[in-house]
Regions:
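Acidic/histidine-rich helix-loop elements
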Residues: 76-89, 117-130, 172-175
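Accessory beta->alpha helical hairpin/"wing" motif in late/C-terminal subdomains of nucleic-acid enzymes
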Residues: 298-301
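Serine-esterase "nucleophile elbow" of acetyl-processing enzymes
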Residues: 48-115
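Alpha-helical cap/lid subdomain in secreted, periplasmic
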Residues: 132-293, 311, 315
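Secretory targeting and sorting signals
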Residues: 1-47
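Short, solvent-exposed loop/turn and secondary-structure capping segments
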Residues: 48, 76-80, 121-123, 163-167, ...
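Acidic helix-start/capping segments at beta-turn-to-alpha-helix junctions
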Residues: 110-119, 259-262
Length: 317
């Protein structure tokens, strides 16, 4: 293989390498100009008085919506296997979704406990909380964020007389409910006193009364209709007592009992089902077929009704 000959580069005459003083001055000036131009491109933008007047964007301060209560405060619904589970579709989530667009810094804190009673909310024993109970955790949160809480909602008391539903007759049912109701009302008074003291003035607290799952008994013939009618009278009395406690503490009431038309046994034209029973079946899982039903928790549409009732009562909608 023949070697490749690399041509020799031409040699510039020595005279061409020399520069005059004037030439060097011009070259130096050009280099300085180039450096200055590069510095101008990579350096800070020139001052603009109009832009200087625009303040930096402010991050909105965090405010809070505190949701307290039982399983409804956690959006509990039955899953496909019929197991009651917490969901992100409860009334608290829907209230938060309605409030947040106009309040970018708003945060939702849910402390509700499925199965909670007024007594366990005070003393603990069902769900685990720092401080031992839901009420202690709520008080600690309100004290730590005083002046930054927009809204507190509460649903509690439905589970207190719930065990009375297992009584063998109407007489026993009524006696059981009458026995349990005064204690629940007293406990609610304690809860509200402590919440109001921790929250301070100006915080909106809205308590909820309840719809009545026992209305579903109406569908089981005459005996069931008597149970539904009797249960509605007891529920109306109980909800009125809860309402008086809320009003005495300065809280507002979300009238879910009324929103579900619980007291209305009239039958709309062309139907054989009372309006209150139809609403219960429409907005809860109580009338659903197994495995999801019967389940007393609200469905998504029912939680939407409850959320709307809370918003109207709060005055924030």
């Amino acid at each position: 293989m023949r070697p490749v000959r690399i041509p020799r580069l031409p040699r510039f005459p020595r005279a061409a390498a020399r520069t005059t003083t004037a030439a060097r001055t011009v070259t130096a000036a050009a280099v300085v100009a180039v450096i200055a131009a590069l510095t101008a491109c990579s350096g800070p933008a020139p001052s603009n008085p109009a832009l200087a007047k625009i303040p930096p964007a402010k991050v909105p301060p965090a405010t809070y919506y505190l949701a307290l209560g039982d399983s409804l405060a956690q959006g509990v619904q039955p899953n496909a296997a019929g197991v009651s589970v917490m969901t992100p579709d409860g009334y608290a989530d829907q209230v938060y979704a309605a409030l947040r667009p106009s309040r970018p810094g708003l945060k939702l804190v849910k402390l509700g406990c499925p199965g909670e009673t007024t007594a366990s909310m005070i003393n603990g024993g069902i769900c685990r909380y720092q401080g031992g109970s839901q009420l202690a955790a709520a008080v600690a949160f309100l004290q730590a964020h005083r002046g930054r809480v927009l809204l507190v909602t509460l649903d509690i008391g439905a589970n207190d007389p719930e065990h009375c539903g297992g009584q063998p007759g109407l007489g026993q049912l009524a006696k059981c409910a009458v026995k349990d109701i005064p204690g629940a009302v007293d406990h609610l008074g304690t809860i509200m006193t402590r919440l109001k003291a921790a929250a301070g003035p100006g915080v909106r607290i809205v308590g909820m009364n309840y719809y009545l799952p026992a209305l579903a008994e109406w569908r089981s013939g005459l005996p069931g209709r008597v149970v539904a009618w009797t249960a509605e009278k007891l529920a109306a009395t109980y909800n009125a007592m809860l309402g008086r406690v809320y009003a005495k503490s300065g809280a507002r009431v979300a009238n879910v009992f009324g929103a579900f038309e619980t007291a209305d046994f009239t039958k709309p034209a062309g139907t054989n089902v009372p309006r209150n029973v139809a609403r219960l079946c429409q907005w809860t899982w109580e009338c659903a077929a197994p495995p999801r039903g019967p389940n007393q928790h609200a469905n998504q549409a029912g939680y939407q009704v409850i959320a709307r009732t809370f918003l109207q009562a709060s005055g924030l909608s």
